[in-house]
């Protein structure tokens, strides 16, 4: 009886809608689970008894899951007989490190469940219907997930998952690579590998820069069209402004043309004036005496 109690842990403060499979996902990473006795009362919270094959696995589970934040519920994990000596020792030895099997209450409260970490994996081959919550539920089988994200690009649906410690990340790489991913709409096999900041961080940035370049090119085309429309709208004004000085210039040489117009007249008059003056003087002088002389010659014989 005592040996079994040393292999069984009590898990308290569970959500009211938790399932037995989720409890197994929480504790299977610490060792083979023999039995799970889940109790979900009408009024939450729920609780469960998890029996391991080895007492050392139970100790590891207490170290890793006591104080763990599961969907906003702070789990309470201790030996099934009620002793909390191991979990108290856990708080004293694991809170400061941050890379232990789990998080203590103080550490979990300060970090929160959605804090980013450097222990990151990349998940490819996700169905298009996958959400960040679906990804988080699937990757919990490998360890403590503190962040999950799903984004879509030309290559398909990809996920990024952060674990709270290095051991969980390594375990997830071994256990969850090339495994079946399922949600309420579809399923498929996913590949899991360690996240490479140099190679993997470029793809989202490229997509973002591509969208920005589109917006910039559109903005430029609009600005060009606007500038063209403005230049076109201004062109009549420019023409009018150009015409106005043209009119002024046409008006200003107007008198010049008038002054020029009489100049040929003057030249003509000058050219004509001497000619008729000579002709008039020559023609008029003989013409006038001719009729005067003619009657004289006619009258003289009459007399």
UniProtKB/Swiss-Prot annotation:
Disordered, as annotated region: 81-116, 195-303
Subcellular localization: Nucleus speckle; Nucleus, Nucleoplasm
Tissue: Ubiquitous.
Biased composition, class Basic residues, residue ranges: 209-245, 257-271
Principal location: nucleus
Domain of life: Eukaryota
Keywords associated with the record: mRNA processing, mRNA splicing, Nucleus, Phosphoprotein, Repeat, RNA-binding, Spliceosome
SUPFAM superfamilies linked: RNA-binding domain, RBD
Ranges annotated as biased composition (Low complexity): 246-256, 284-295
GO CC term (a single one): nucleus
One Pfam family cited in the UniProt record for this chain: RRM_1
Ranges for domain RRM: 7-82, 119-197
GO biological processes: mRNA processing; RNA splicing
UniProt PTM comment: Extensively phosphorylated on serine residues in the RS domain.
Compositional bias of kind Basic and acidic residues: 81-91
Region forming the signal peptide: none
CDD domains membership: RRM1_SF2_plant_like, RRM2_SF2_plant_like
Gly residues bias spans: 94-111
Function: General splicing factor. Can promote splice site selection in vitro presumably by antagonizing the effects of the A1 heterogeneous nuclear ribonucleoprotein. May have an essential function during early plant development.
Family, per entry: Belongs to the splicing factor SR family. SR subfamily.
Protein known as: Serine/arginine-rich-splicing factor SR34
